[in-house]
C-alpha cells in the first residue's frame, strides 16, 4: 500500500501537523517534517495513540514509559467473587443493571443543557492533544458521579456486595444490548429532527454511530465514572477566527468502518482540492419572494434557497432543458414557484432606475391650468393629411417632402380663436407603423383623414386601431370633397362596418367633410377639435418639473443631437437638466416649428431642443431633474442595464427551433450599413428591410445610425464582404466618397423610402438562385431503329410536333413513361447533317448514351430557360 504523509493524518484528525509530529516522536518514530510518509500500519498506530492515549503493543518495547499501576489484589479478588455471584444470580443482577441504566439516562437528560453549553465553549477554544486527559470513544460520554446521586449509589452498593464494580464480559454484552435497544428510537428522532429553522445556528442532528462498532472492549478503572451512550452529538458552527479543525471522527467512521489499524485498512485522502462544504441551511418561511422578470436559473435558486441542481432537475421533469446561466421566462418562474410551494412576486428591475416613475406630478388644484390640446393627424398615404395641415398652417410642407409623401413626424403649433393647438403629422406609408403608433399614444385627439374618392384603405384601418388602443377620441375628416368622384356616404358606410358610426346616424363619432385644396370645412373641423378639448378638460401644472415626449430626434451639423418634443406637464426652460433614456444633458437652445428661438415651452406646446448627449430614441419620455449628477446616474444605469440585457441573451433553443436555426445559418445574406437623417425614419427602414426575406435570402443590417455617412462606416463596409452603404435623406461628403472609391465600397442614397426598398429587393433577387423553367420544342415518333457498328443505335423518326434541334435536351418516352433523358448527339436529313428538322419531315436521330430505342417510342425535345427570381 502507498504510504501516508503526516499532514494527511493531521487533516484527517483535524489537528495541527506539529502536534502530530510530537505524538509520533513520542512513539519513537523520529518524524521531522509534515511531508514525511509512514506505512499504513504506523499511521494506524498514530491514530490509535492520539485517540486512546494508549501506546500500541508494537511500540512499548522501544519506549520507556512509566509503569502502569497494577490493580490491587483486593480488586482482583473482588472481581472474581463478582463473577461467581453473577453466575449464581444472573437474573437479579440483570434487573439491577437495568435500574442503573435507567437512572443514569435520567441524570444524562438533566445535565444535557449544561453539557451543551460546555461543548459550545470548548468549541471556541483551540484544541490540542495535550488537553485530552482521557480517551473519548466515538458515541460515548463519561459522566462523573455527583454527590447528590444518592439513588444510583444505593443501587450500585447492592451490586458492590461482591466488592468493586468492574465491567466483565457479560456487562459488555449488556452494554451492546442497551445500544441496540436505543437504535430504533434514535433513528425515529433523526427523522423528526430533519425539519428545523435555518436561523438556528446549532444543529441538533443526531448521528447513527452505533452501526459496525464494537463496544465490547470498554472498561473503566475509575469507580466514580460511568460510561453512557452519547445521543446528543452536535455539529457546532466554528467561529470565523478559529482556523484549527475539530477531529473528523465522523468521516473516519463513514469512510472506513474498521478504522486505522483494524481490518479494512486505511482510507487515503484524495490529492484533489477539497470541495467546499456547504452548510445545510433551511429556508426561512417567508410570505413572498421578490423575483426579477429577467433572472437566470442559478439566481432563482439562490432567491428561493434551493440548490441549482434541484431547480434544473425540476425544469427537466417539466420538459425544459436548461443550464444554470439560462434565463427563465415568467411562465417558467410561476410554474417553479408552484412546484416548490413558494409564493413569489415578479418585479421588474428596470423600475429601480425608472425616472418616469420617480417623477411626481403636482396635483394642487390651484396650480393647474388649461393646456393646449395635442392633435394627431392619421390616415392612408396620399389621402391629404399633410395638405390639410398645410392649409391650417398656411404653409407648403407637403411640397417639400420627397415624392410628395410624408416621411417624418412633424409637430406644429397653430392658433384658433386665441387658443393654441398642437398638431402632429404622421406618415401614412405602411413602413411607418411605429411612428403612427407613437403619435396615437401621446395625443389627446386623433383626426383620421379619409379620401372621399378612395374610401377606407389598409393604413386607415391601422390608424383607427392605433387610436382605439390609445383610448383617445376620434374625429373623421372626409377629405377631397371638391372632387367630382367624391362619395362621402361610401366612406361612412365602410367606417360603420368598423363600428365607427357617424353622429347623424345615431353614433358617437364626428364626421366633417373638408377640402385641403379649397379650405372647405376647415373652420368647422377646428371648432369641433376645440369643443372636444373642452369636454376632455385638459389641464397641467406649469410650475412643476417638465415632462415631455420625444416625437423625433436627429443629428444636425453644428448643433449635435436635437429632439422634437411635446411638453405634457411642467415648463421646460433653457438651462434645464434633462434625461431621456440613455441621453441626458442641459437644454442649450430651443426653437418652435418655424425656427424661432424660444425661452420656454409650456404644457401642450411643441418645440425643438438642443443639448442632449446623444440621439434619444423616438418615443422616449424626457424628464427635467434637479442636478446633472442625478441625470447622469439615470442615463448610465439605463445604459448599463440595456447593455447587460443585450450581452446576456440566452442562446438556448428548443428542438423545434434547432432546425430553424440550422436553416437560418444556410441563408444567403446581403450585408447593409444603414444611415438616416432622423431616428423615426431609421426605425421604419430597419423594420421594412428586416421583412425582405424568404427561405433563401435575407438582409443583414450590420450597423445603423442617425447622421451622415462617415469614414468609419466605409471602413466597416470594406471589412464586410459584398456589403453596401444605404443612406436615407443624407449625402456623403467628398472625403467619404474618395474613401469609398479607394476601398471599393458602394454607396447608395435615397430620399423616397419605397425607392430604397425596391432597389434592395432587386439586389436580393440577383443573389437568389434563378428560376429554371422548361420550353417544349417538338416531338418525334420512332418508326425504325438502325444499329450502326461502332456508333450505336440510330432512330428513324417522323417529326410530329414543333422542331427537333441538334444538341437539344430530349426525353425518350415509352408508353407514356420517361425511360431515358439525354441530349441529341446527331441529327441528319437523308445523308446530310441538319441543324433542325421541322414538323412533317423525317430524320435520323442519335441519342447520346442510349442503346435501348424501340419502334413506337417518342422523342420529346425541350430546352431549359432561366429566369431571375424576385421577392
UniProtKB/Swiss-Prot annotation:
<dbReference type="GO" id="GO:0005525">
    <property type="term" value="F:GTP binding"/>
</dbReference>
<feature type="region of interest" description="G1">
    <location>
        <begin position="379"/>
        <end position="386"/>
    </location>
</feature>
<comment type="similarity">
    <text>Belongs to the TRAFAC class translation factor GTPase superfamily. Classic translation factor GTPase family. IF-2 subfamily.</text>
</comment>
<dbReference type="Pfam" id="PF22042">
    <property type="entry name" value="EF-G_D2"/>
</dbReference>
<dbReference type="InterPro" id="IPR015760">
    <property type="entry name" value="TIF_IF2"/>
</dbReference>
<feature type="region of interest" description="G3">
    <location>
        <begin position="425"/>
        <end position="428"/>
    </location>
</feature>
<feature type="region of interest" description="Disordered">
    <location>
        <begin position="184"/>
        <end position="203"/>
    </location>
</feature>
<feature type="binding site">
    <location>
        <begin position="479"/>
        <end position="482"/>
    </location>
    <ligand>
        <name>GTP</name>
    </ligand>
</feature>
<dbReference type="GO" id="GO:0005829">
    <property type="term" value="C:cytosol"/>
</dbReference>
<feature type="region of interest" description="Disordered">
    <location>
        <begin position="60"/>
        <end position="101"/>
    </location>
</feature>
<dbReference type="InterPro" id="IPR006847">
    <property type="entry name" value="IF2_N"/>
</dbReference>
<comment type="function">
    <text>One of the essential components for the initiation of protein synthesis. Protects formylmethionyl-tRNA from spontaneous hydrolysis and promotes its binding to the 30S ribosomal subunits. Also involved in the hydrolysis of GTP during the formation of the 70S ribosomal complex.</text>
</comment>
<dbReference type="InterPro" id="IPR036925">
    <property type="entry name" value="TIF_IF2_dom3_sf"/>
</dbReference>
<keyword id="KW-0963">Cytoplasm</keyword>
<feature type="compositionally biased region" description="Basic residues">
    <location>
        <begin position="61"/>
        <end position="72"/>
    </location>
</feature>
<dbReference type="Pfam" id="PF04760">
    <property type="entry name" value="IF2_N"/>
</dbReference>
<keyword id="KW-0342">GTP-binding</keyword>
<feature type="domain" description="tr-type G">
    <location>
        <begin position="370"/>
        <end position="537"/>
    </location>
</feature>
<feature type="region of interest" description="G2">
    <location>
        <begin position="404"/>
        <end position="408"/>
    </location>
</feature>
<dbReference type="InterPro" id="IPR044145">
    <property type="entry name" value="IF2_II"/>
</dbReference>
<protein>
    <recommendedName>
        <fullName>Translation initiation factor IF-2</fullName>
    </recommendedName>
</protein>
<dbReference type="InterPro" id="IPR005225">
    <property type="entry name" value="Small_GTP-bd"/>
</dbReference>
<dbReference type="InterPro" id="IPR053905">
    <property type="entry name" value="EF-G-like_DII"/>
</dbReference>
<dbReference type="GO" id="GO:0003743">
    <property type="term" value="F:translation initiation factor activity"/>
</dbReference>
<dbReference type="InterPro" id="IPR000795">
    <property type="entry name" value="T_Tr_GTP-bd_dom"/>
</dbReference>
<dbReference type="InterPro" id="IPR023115">
    <property type="entry name" value="TIF_IF2_dom3"/>
</dbReference>
<dbReference type="GO" id="GO:0003924">
    <property type="term" value="F:GTPase activity"/>
</dbReference>
<feature type="region of interest" description="G5">
    <location>
        <begin position="515"/>
        <end position="517"/>
    </location>
</feature>
<keyword id="KW-0648">Protein biosynthesis</keyword>
<feature type="binding site">
    <location>
        <begin position="425"/>
        <end position="429"/>
    </location>
    <ligand>
        <name>GTP</name>
    </ligand>
</feature>
<dbReference type="InterPro" id="IPR004161">
    <property type="entry name" value="EFTu-like_2"/>
</dbReference>
<dbReference type="Pfam" id="PF03144">
    <property type="entry name" value="GTP_EFTU_D2"/>
</dbReference>
<dbReference type="InterPro" id="IPR000178">
    <property type="entry name" value="TF_IF2_bacterial-like"/>
</dbReference>
<feature type="region of interest" description="G4">
    <location>
        <begin position="479"/>
        <end position="482"/>
    </location>
</feature>
<feature type="compositionally biased region" description="Basic and acidic residues">
    <location>
        <begin position="73"/>
        <end position="101"/>
    </location>
</feature>
<feature type="binding site">
    <location>
        <begin position="379"/>
        <end position="386"/>
    </location>
    <ligand>
        <name>GTP</name>
    </ligand>
</feature>
<dbReference type="InterPro" id="IPR027417">
    <property type="entry name" value="P-loop_NTPase"/>
</dbReference>
<dbReference type="InterPro" id="IPR009000">
    <property type="entry name" value="Transl_B-barrel_sf"/>
</dbReference>
<dbReference type="Pfam" id="PF00009">
    <property type="entry name" value="GTP_EFTU"/>
</dbReference>
<keyword id="KW-0547">Nucleotide-binding</keyword>
<keyword id="KW-0396">Initiation factor</keyword>
<dbReference type="Pfam" id="PF11987">
    <property type="entry name" value="IF-2"/>
</dbReference>
Amino acid at each position: 500500500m502507498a504510504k501516508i504523509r503526516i499532514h494527511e493524518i493531521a487533516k484527517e484528525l483535524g489537528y495541527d501537523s506539529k502536534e502530530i509530529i510530537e505524538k509520533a516522536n513520542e512513539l519513537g518514530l523520529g518524524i521531522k517534517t509534515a511531508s514525511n510518509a509512514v506505512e499504513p500500519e504506523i499511521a494506524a498506530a498514530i491514530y490509535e495513540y492520539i485517540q486512546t492515549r494508549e501506546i500500541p503493543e508494537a511500540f512499548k518495547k522501544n519506549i520507556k514509559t512509566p509503569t502502569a499501576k497494577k490493580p490491587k489484589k483486593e480488586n482482583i479478588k473482588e472481581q472474581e467473587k463478582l463473577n461467581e455471584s453473577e453466575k449464581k444470580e444472573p437474573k437479579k443482577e440483570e434487573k439491577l443493571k437495568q435500574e442503573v441504566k435507567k437512572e443514569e439516562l435520567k441524570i444524562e437528560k438533566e445535565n444535557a443543557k449544561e453539557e451543551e453549553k460546555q461543548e459550545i465553549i470548548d468549541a471556541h477554544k483551540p484544541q490540542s492533544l495535550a488537553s485530552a486527559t482521557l480517551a473519548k470513544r466515538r458515541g460515548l460520554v463519561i459522566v462523573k458521579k455527583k454527590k447528590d446521586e444518592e439513588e444510583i449509589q444505593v443501587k450500585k452498593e447492592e451490586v458492590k456486595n461482591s466488592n468493586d464494580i468492574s465491567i466483565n464480559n457479560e456487562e459488555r454484552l449488556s452494554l451492546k444490548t442497551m445500544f441496540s435497544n436505543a437504535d430504533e428510537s434514535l433513528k425515529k428522532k433523526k427523522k423528526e429532527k430533519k425539519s428545523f429553522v435555518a436561523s438556528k445556528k446549532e444543529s441538533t442532528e443526531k448521528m447513527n454511530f452505533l452501526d459496525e462498532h464494537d463496544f465490547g472492549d470498554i472498561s473503566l478503572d475509575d469507580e466514580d465514572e460511568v460510561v453512557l451512550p452519547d445521543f446528543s452529538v452536535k455539529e457546532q458552527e466554528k467561529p470565523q477566527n478559529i482556523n484549527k479543525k475539530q477531529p473528523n471522527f465522523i468521516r473516519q467512521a463513514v469512510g472506513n468502518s474498521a478504522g486505522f489499524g483494524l481490518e479494512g485498512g486505511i482510507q487515503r485522502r484524495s490529492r484533489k482540492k477539497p470541495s467546499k462544504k456547504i452548510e445545510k441551511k433551511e429556508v426561512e418561511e417567508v410570505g413572498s419572494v421578490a423575483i426579477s422578470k429577467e433572472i437566470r436559473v442559478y439566481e432563482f435558486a439562490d432567491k428561493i434557497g434551493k440548490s441549482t441542481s434541484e431547480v434544473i432537475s425540476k425544469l427537466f421533469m417539466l420538459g425544459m432543458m436548461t443550464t444554470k446561466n439560462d434565463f427563465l421566462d415568467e411562465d417558467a418562474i410561476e410554474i417553479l414557484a408552484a412546484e416548490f410551494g413558494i409564493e413569489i412576486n415578479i418585479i421588474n428591475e428596470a423600475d429601480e432606475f425608472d425616472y418616469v416613475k420617480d417623477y411626481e406630478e403636482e396635483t394642487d388644484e390651484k396650480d393647474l391650468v388649461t393646456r393646449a390640446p395635442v392633435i394627431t393627424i392619421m390616415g392612408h398615404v396620399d389621402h391629404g393629411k399633410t395638405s390639410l395641415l398645410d392649409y391650417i398652417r398656411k404653409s407648403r410642407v407637403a411640397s417639400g417632402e420627397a415624392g410628395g409623401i410624408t416621411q417624418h413626424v412633424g409637430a406644429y403649433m397653430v392658433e384658433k380663436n386665441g387658443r393654441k393647438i398642437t398638431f402632429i403629422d404622421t406618415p401614412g406609408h405602411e413602413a411607418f407603423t411605429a411612428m403612427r403608433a407613437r403619435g396615437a399614444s401621446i395625443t389627446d385627439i386623433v383626426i383620421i383623414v379619409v379620401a372621399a374618392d378612395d374610401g377606407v384603405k389598409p393604413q386607415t384601418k391601422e390608424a383607427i386601431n392605433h387610436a382605439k388602443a390609445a383610448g383617445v377620441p376620434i374625429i373623421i375628416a372626409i377629405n377631397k370633397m371638391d372632387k367630382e368622384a367624391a362619395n362621402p356616404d361610401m366612406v361612412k358606410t365602410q367606417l360603420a362596418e368598423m363600428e365607427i358610426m357617424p353622429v347623424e346616424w345615431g353614433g358617437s363619432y364626428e364626421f366633417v367633410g373638408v377640402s385641403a385644396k379649397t379650405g372647405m370645412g376647415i373652420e368647422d373641423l377646428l371648432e369641433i377639435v376645440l369643443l372636444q378639448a373642452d369636454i376632455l378638460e385638459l389641464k397641467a401644472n406649469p410650475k412643476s418639473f417638465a415632462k415631455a415626449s420625444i416625437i423625433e430626434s436627429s443629428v444636425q451639423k453644428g448643433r449635435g443631437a436635437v429632439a422634437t418634443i411635446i411638453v405634457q406637464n411642467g415648463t421646460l426652460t433653457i438651462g434645464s437638466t434633462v434625461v431621456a433614456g440613455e441621453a441626458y444633458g442641459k437644454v442649450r437652445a430651443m426653437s418652435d416649428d418655424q425656427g424661432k428661438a424660444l425661452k420656454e415651452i409650456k404644457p401642450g406646446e411643441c418645440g425643438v431642443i438642443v443639448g442632449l448627449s446623444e440621439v434619444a430614441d423616438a418615443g422616449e419620455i424626457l424628464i427635467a431633474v434637479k442636478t446633472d449628477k442625478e441625470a447622469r446616474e439615470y442615463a448610465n444605469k439605463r445604459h448599463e442595464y440595456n447593455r447587460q440585457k443585450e450581452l446576456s441573451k440566452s442562446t438556448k433553443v428548443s428542438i423545434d427551433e434547432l432546425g430553424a436555426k440550422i436553416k437560418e445559418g444556410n441563408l444567403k445574406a446581403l450585408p447593409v450599413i444603414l444611415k438616416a437623417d432622423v431616428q423615426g425614419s431609421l426605425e421604419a427602414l430597419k423594420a421594412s428591410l428586416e421583412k425582405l426575406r424568404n427561405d433563401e435570402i435575407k438582409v443583414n443590417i450590420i450597423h445603423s445610425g442617425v447622421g451622415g455617412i462617415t469614414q468609419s462606416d466605409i471602413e466597416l463596409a470594406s471589412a464586410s464582404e459584398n456589403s453596401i452603404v444605404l443612406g436615407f435623406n443624407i449625402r456623403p461628403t467628398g472625403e467619404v466618397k474618395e474613401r469609398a472609391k479607394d476601398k471599393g465600397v458602394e454607396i447608395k442614397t435615397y430620399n423616397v423610402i419605397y425607392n430604397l426598398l425596391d432597389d434592395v429587393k432587386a439586389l436580393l433577387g440577383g443573389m437568389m438562385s434563378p428560376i429554371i423553367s422548361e420550353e417544349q420544342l417538338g416531338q418525334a415518333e420512332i418508326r425504325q431503329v438502325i444499329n450502326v457498328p461502332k456508333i450505336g443505335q440510330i432512330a428513324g423518326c417522323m417529326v410530329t410536333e414543333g422542331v427537333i434541334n441538334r444538341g437539344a435536351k430530349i426525353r425518350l418516352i415509352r408508353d407514356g413513361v420517361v425511360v431515358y433523358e439525354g441530349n441529341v448527339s446527331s441529327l441528319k436529313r437523308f445523308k446530310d447533317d441538319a441543324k433542325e428538322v421541322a414538323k412533317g419531315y423525317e430524320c435520323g436521330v442519335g441519342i447520346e448514351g442510349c442503346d435501348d430505342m424501340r419502334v413506337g417510342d417518342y422523342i420529346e425535345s425541350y430546352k431549359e430557360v432561366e429566369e431571375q427570381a424576385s421577392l
